[in-house]
Each structure stands twice: as structure tokens, then as C-alpha cells.
Amino acid sequence: MPSRRRGPSRQQLSRSALPSIQTLVGGGCGNGTGLRNRNGNAIGLPVPPTTALITPGPVRHCQIPDLPVDGSLFFEFLFFIYLLIVLFIQYINIYKTVWWYPYNHPASCTSLNFHLIDYYLAAFITVMLARRLVWALISEATKAGAASTVHYTALILARLVLLTLCGWVLCWTLVNLFRSHSVLNLLFLGYPFGVYVPLYCFHQDSRAHLLLTDYVVQHQAVEEAASNVGSLARSKDFLSLLLESLKEQFNNATPIPTHSCPLSPDLIRNEVECLKADFNHRIKEVLFNSLFSAYYVAFLPLCFVKSTQYYDMRWSCEHLIMVWINAFVMLTTQLLPSKYCDLLHKSAAHLGKWQKLEHGFYSNAPQHIWSENTIWPQGVLVRHSRCLYRAMGPYNVAVPSDVSHARFYFLFHRPLRVLNLLILIEGSVVFYQLYSLLRSEKWNHTLSMALILFCNYYVLFKLLRDRIVLGRAYSYPLNSYELKAN
């Protein structure tokens, strides 16, 4: 029989019909991973750099309007008035009387037991609460400058008189408190300072020495400056750190850094480190000052109450928690304004994020060895520290194994995350206070809730105003900004 020409086998046909994987992915499976055949041997394919595969486009930022922010002196004045109001409310909760009863006791003719109030303690608390306002007043007067020698001399004398008066009142109240109270009670007066020293002095960073304007220089100069700053910070003694931290504590006018949109991955990471240190310092200042205010306003008066005096412990503790939450939100709103949160959002957009993958997945996908000098596009798989990661952001220069980079991206890649959290906290407090106001049966509960609500309405109004304006600004298409700019 005549032999027929046999066609290609099914296996050969399937192999010849498929294009090469190098053509599909552009040869991007490289840097030691590559493709493997059935025997497990690697197929040597030429691997172009990652930038030849996909070039990440430039990061485009939204333009937000300049929202009004309270000045340092005005905010400190409002914050001081708020603390005085809640201090007055706490004294009402402790020393209230049933003044509508018949006059069987001399104290029942007044709404408070004024003869039980320690006025030296009240004066001491007032001076401690006014420390930020006094320093803000001095700072604003110093910024104004002196037009003549007489003006400068009068300014110096006014500062000396003001500081001397505050110091004299503080010493006078302390001497009288030492005479009338035990040593155990007096230890409560300085407890926040015992927390302040380890919080600020033992965890000093180089935030005050690193400026974001330094990121425009070359990377080598930045590294040399950082190493010099680190050696200077390590050579400081404890007294220098204490004085520096006290100066930063009283300096309310903290400048907001700027964003320079760096193109180098090293510069982006350095900018993130500086912003992260600055953000941690601001949060530390918010936590300390809010706890400091709540401690002296709501907790310290309870420590000096006589054992024979009855007061509602649950309501006083609830008042303490409310004061701390409100102070925390007010300080956070002032120290983390919208411009600052937008700056953190822009830096997070340049940083990117990596998602850790389990072993066994994406075994046939192109994989790369992570390099610190590469800007990785979205969806790229890299290997770092024997783990597999996938790029999640449009720009990715973060270290895959660095948890702090992942936290930074999680907090700030959405620009309204911090603002939404503050609105949720303050709104929950306001709704709870309204509910307590409706169900209150005692006159001191009604008065305290009504006064605090007036203060919280102002804070909630500012938060909602910023949320509405920024929400519309961030939802605006980026192409519209480009057309408007052109």
C-alpha cells in the first residue's frame, strides 16, 4: 500500500501553535526565577529590565482648596476656655448640693459646697492649664518683632513679668498645698511630668534636624547629613534632650513640611521616613496634651476630695473620658490640618504597597528580585527575603518587608481616612451626650451636658465642613485639573 505522509502529532501541534511565553510577557520572568520545564530545569531566556516592560506613569495629585485653620493663639485661647468650663463642671459634679431643700444647713442655700473646695488646688490647676496659652502669647509677641529699642525692651520686660507672675502663683499654691495635704496626695500633682520624661526624652529622633527641603539635593549628601545628625543626637546628654523636648513642647507653631514629588526611590523613602517621624511626634504631642488636660481637669480634683464627701463616681469617670476624647479631637484637628493630611497622602501615593503572597501561587508568572533603585509598576511580582510580594500601588518603592511602610500606606493612601475617623469619634460623642441629656434627671447632669455640647458643636462643625469640601475636591477628575492648567 502506498505510504501516506503522516501529519504532525497532537503534541507537536499544540506546542507549535502556542507563541513563546517570552513574547507574551516580554521576557520579564527573570532575575533567577525564569521558566521551568517538566524536568524542573530552568529555561534560559534573556530578561530585560522591569522598566522595559511597563513604565509607571507619573503620580497625579488632586488640588485642594485652602481651608481656614485657627491660629495658634486663638486655638490655645479656645482650648483654655474649654478646659476651664469642664473643670467648673467637674467641681459641680463633686460639690453639688440640694439647694432647693429647706435651709437646715448653711451650705444648702447655695448650689455648691464652697467651703469644701480647695481654692489653692483650683489655682494650681488653672496655672497648669494656661501654660500653653501663656507660651503662645509670648511666641506671638516675639514674632511681631520690635520696631525700636524701646519696644524691644518693653517686650522683654512684659515676658519677664508674665513668666514671673505665673511662676510666683505656681509656687504660692504649691506651698499652701504642702501645708494642708499629705505627701501621698501631693504626688498626684507631678505624675504627668513623670510620664513626660520617658515619653519625650528617651525616644528622641532627628525630626527637628531633618527638613524636607533637603530632599532636592543628591542622595549622597542626604545620607551624610543623616549620619552626622545621628551622631550628634547620640552624643547629647540627658539634660540637653530634656531642654530640647521642653522647648518643642511649648513651641505651638510647628511648621508644616512640603512635598517635592521626588523621582528617586531613595529620596521617596527618605521623605516618608521624615514625614513618619514628624507624624509620630505630632501624635505623641496630641496624646500627651490630651491626657495632661484630662488628668488635671477631671482626675486631680477627685484625688483631693475628703473621705466624708460623697460624689457620683460613675458620672465623674464618664466626664473624665469625655474630656479626654474631646481634647484629643481638638488637638488632632489643630495639629493635623487638611494640608498636612494631603501631604501625607501624596507621599503615600509615591511610596506604594506590597502584598505578601503564599508559596505555590503564581509559580509560572514572571518574578523579579526586588531592587531598591527600581520603581515597580502595579501587579509586578518580586522576591524579597525569601518571600513573594505583589505590587499594589501604581508606584511602588517601599521595602516589602518593612511593616512601617505598609502602615504608612494604609493610613494615608486614602486622603480622608483620618478626617473620617475624627468625625466618627466626635459624632459618636455628640450623639451619646444628646442621649444622656434627654435621659438626665439631675440638674448637674443636664448643666454639664449642655455646656460640653456647645463646645463639641463647634468642633463637629469644622470637621463636617472640611469633609464636605475635601470630599468634593478629591472626587473631582484629575483630567479636569490638567485641562484647567493647560
Curated annotation (Swiss-Prot):
The keyword S-adenosyl-L-methionine does not apply. Pfam families: Tmp39. Interacts with SACM1L, SEC23A and SEC24A. Its main location: endoplasmic reticulum. GO terms for cellular component: endoplasmic reticulum membrane. Belongs to the TMEM39 family. InterPro entries: Uncharacterised_TMEM39. It comes from Mus musculus (Mouse). This is Transmembrane protein 39A. Keywords: Autophagy, Endoplasmic reticulum, Glycoprotein, Membrane, Transmembrane, Transmembrane helix. The keyword Transmembrane applies. The chain crosses the membrane at residues 72-92, 110-130, 155-175, 182-202, 285-305, 317-337, 418-438, 444-464. It is found in: Endoplasmic reticulum membrane.
